[in-house]
Every structure is written in C-alpha cells, then in structure tokens.
Amino acid sequence: YHEFACVQLHNTLMGRGDIIKETTLEIFNTKDKEYWNPIPKVSKNHMEYEVTSSEVDMWQSFDRSIGHHFNLSIDLNSCTGCGACVIACHAENNVPVVGKDEVRKSRDMHWLRIDLYYSSGETFKADDQTKEDIDGLGDSLSTFGKMEQASQNPQVAFQPVMCQHCNHAPCETVCPVAASSHGRQGQNHMAYNRCVGTRYCANNCPYKVRRFNSVSYTHLTLPTRSTV
C-alpha cells in the first residue's frame, strides 16, 4: 500500500476566533484610534502608567533616514486561502523540499503558511460566549476538547503568515553567531554559511515562521566507481 501525506489540516485552528480581529470599514473609521492601538502601560508601585513605545523599548532605534524601505500588505478581504502564494514562494525563492517522509512527520518547510480558523459554533462570537460560560477546570478541559471539532457550517477566516521582519526581531538577539541580522532597509537577514544550527531563533520567533532543513540533498553519498 502507499501512505499519503495529507496536509489539509495543518495550521488549522478550531474555536480560536477570539484572536481574529475583523471589523467593517465604517466601524474602523468611527472608533477612536486608542481603541485599535491602545497606549502601552507599565506597572509601577501597583499603579499603571501610560508610556510611549520608545520608553519601554529595550533597544536603540535604527536609523531610517536613508535608503529604501520595504513593505508588504495583504488584502484579507480578497484572500480565499487557496495556497497559490505558498507555491509561488517556493518557486520564486527556490525553497528546498524535505521529502515525503518528512512531510508525513509534519515537517513540511514553507517560508509562507496560511492559518485557517474555523468556528466550533455557527460564528466566532458563539465560540467566545462558550468560553465565557466555562466554569472550573473540569468544565474547561471538556469544553475546549469539544471545540476542537469544527461546525458543520462554520465561520471561516484565513491568515497568511510569513516573516514579519520585526523592527527588533527576537530571532536576531538570541543568535550566538549573528547569523540573523537586521538590514538597513528594514529586512531581517540570514547568513546561511554562518548558522551553526542552534535553532534559538526558531524557539524565539513569536510567529513560528523560522524553518530549518537539516537534510542536504546536494551532498548525498554516491557509490564510488573505479576504472581498471
């Protein structure tokens, strides 16, 4: 028999609609900016104080006065989760494959993934209400277990996720050999020949988009042949 590698349910989340922030343009324009971008607060002497982002930043800001700066925007109103961008990213960047055996172990390596969010109830709001009604640890375990199943007619949301090229990227600060570095154009750079494979960057990435390919298909041991 042949064992197929099915990846349809990879990166699929049920009952997690509370982390999806969706609204209409009318509501977005009528709400105050503090509603969408609340001012950060720190606790001092058990009192909360409003601070600016620069005051709580541990790192010095980069010089953005010169050079080009790149930006990528995704229209989530148009995204249908087809996965064509994942295939295009593979082709454009010549991303190496890991083989069918590794894919069966959920080790498929893409630089771009699409998270799929399905509601356990009819809507994401219904899921939020279900979570609000949870009473106690036992009820929590059973309820969240049931929410792992999607509704027959669920509300669906798609979220393409790739490297965010963070301003002060966590993957850069933990690399012991500076293989991950920050470029002048705002991009997160990676020096492959400097990497020693600690994978600290993957552990420290909040978006879980750092991928490792430990298999080198270009250095396979080939049978030696001698001529007489």
Annotate each PLM feature:
Residues 1-71, 77, 88-91:
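Long, contiguous, secondary-structure-rich segments that constitute the structural scaffold
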Residues 71-92, 125, 157-178, 189-208:
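Cysteine-centered iron-sulfur cluster-binding motifs in ferredoxin-type domains/subunits
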Residues 82-140, 199-205:
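Carboxylate/His-rich catalytic cores and anion/metal-binding grooves
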Residues 135-142, 146, 155, 170-172:
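Phosphate/diphosphate-binding loops
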Residues 150-158:
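Gly-rich Lys/Arg/Thr-decorated short loops/hinges at beta-loop-alpha junctions or inter-strand turns
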Residues 185-186, 216:
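Short glycine/acidic-rich loop motifs that flank beta-strands on beta-rich extracellular proteins
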Residues 218-224:
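Conserved small/polar residues in nucleotide/adenosyl-binding loops
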